[in-house]
């Protein structure tokens, strides 16, 4: 049994420090690197890419709506052409920096509001999928496990990885509980670690209203910017290894 662990990184902006990239990177197998539209400046992104290359961590483009002020968490109604070119721009920028850092962008994972929107809004999803195909159809799309996006992306000819979240509460339908609601983000490292192990072994989680919700995921997201992120990441990693669950990037075939 194996699982990929990913985290959102490269999100610091100038003197504003976000997350703990240097400490989180050794604990994960994949890194979702900001592309400058919701967070991240070129120097910080480049430093994170170089560390990922040094550690052999797989790199992905964490693309977003153009929303620095809102950290990419505000919904936007962009035209097809706007969203298409915004996503192409971000992927291309990260590909260039990654090449200079000695690594390669292997996948695309949308961020924040864009991630949640295209999970069900297939019109916006089409723009994101087309952006990926225009640049490199071998890029893998990471999306919310159980969402309509997974099948839609496969129908569009893309390789897809279904993702679950370690520290987010789920609704009974498999969607994420809104961050605006109490209990949406989980903070107890031991509870979260046990929950992740059960999610992998039993194929689901207990939703916020107490029902078992099936979730089939190949990657688990660990947020590196929450309170206690380091202790939570360590607890999850240790729990997986203790249970004999191998931590490997989904890009590794064997």
Swiss-Prot record:
Q: Which Pfam families match?
A: LamB_YcsF
Q: Which reaction does it catalyse?
A: 5-oxo-L-proline + ATP + 2 H2O = L-glutamate + ADP + phosphate + H(+)
User: From its record, what is one biological process in GO terms?
Assistant: carbohydrate metabolic process
Keywords, ordered alphabetically? ATP-binding, Hydrolase, Nucleotide-binding
According to the UniProt record, what class of enzyme is this? hydrolase
State the CDD domains in the record: LamB_YcsF_like
What InterPro entries is this protein classified in?
Answer: Glyco_hydro/deAcase_b/a-brl, LamB/YcsF/PxpA-like
Enzyme Commission (EC) number: 3.5.2.9
GO molecular function terms listed in the Swiss-Prot or TrEMBL record = 5-oxoprolinase (ATP-hydrolyzing) activity; ATP binding
Q: Which NCBIfam families match?
A: PRK05406.1-3, PRK05406.1-5
What task does this protein carry out? Answer: Catalyzes the cleavage of 5-oxoproline to form L-glutamate coupled to the hydrolysis of ATP to ADP and inorganic phosphate.
Among HAMAP family, the record links this protein to: PxpA
Would you identify the family this protein belongs to, as annotated? Belongs to the LamB/PxpA family.
PANTHER family hit by this protein: 5-OXOPROLINASE SUBUNIT A, UNCHARACTERIZED PROTEIN YBGL-RELATED
Q: How does it assemble?
A: Forms a complex composed of PxpA, PxpB and PxpC.
Query: Any idea what this protein is called?
Result: 5-oxoprolinase subunit A
> What are the top taxonomic ranks of the organism?
Bacteria, Pseudomonadati, Pseudomonadota, Gammaproteobacteria, Moraxellales
Gene that produces this protein: pxpA
């Amino acid at each position: 049994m194996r699982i990929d662990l990913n985290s959102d990184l490269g999100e610091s902006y100038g003197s504003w420090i976000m997350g703990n990239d240097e400490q989180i990177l050794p604990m994960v197998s994949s890194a979702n690197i900001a592309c400058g539209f919701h967070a991240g400046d070129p120097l910080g992104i480049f430093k994170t890419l170089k560390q990922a290359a040094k550690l052999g961590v797989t790199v992905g483009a964490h693309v977003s709506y153009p929303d620095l002020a809102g950290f990419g968490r505000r919904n936007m109604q962009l035209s097809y052409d706007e969203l298409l070119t915004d996503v192409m721009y971000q992927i291309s920028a990260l590909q260039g920096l990654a090449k200079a850092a000695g690594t390669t962008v292997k996948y695309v994972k949308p961020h924040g509001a864009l991630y949640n929107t295209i999970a069900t809004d297939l019109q916006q999803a089409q723009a994101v999928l087309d952006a990926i195909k225009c640049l490199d159809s071998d890029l893998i799309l990471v999306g919310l496990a159980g969402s309509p996006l997974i099948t839609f992306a496969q129908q569009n000819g893309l390789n897809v990885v279904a993702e679950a979240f370690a520290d987010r509460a789920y609704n009974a339908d498999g969607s994420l509980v809104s961050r605006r609601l109490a209990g949406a983000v989980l903070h107890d490292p031991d509870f979260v670690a046990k929950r992740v192990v059960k999610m992998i072994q039993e194929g689901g989680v207990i939703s916020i209203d107490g029902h078992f919700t099936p979730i089939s995921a190949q990657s688990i997201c660990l947020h590196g910017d929450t309170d206690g992120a380091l202790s939570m990441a360590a607890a999850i990693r240790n729990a997986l290894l203790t249970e004999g669950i191998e931590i490997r990037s989904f890009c590794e075939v064997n």
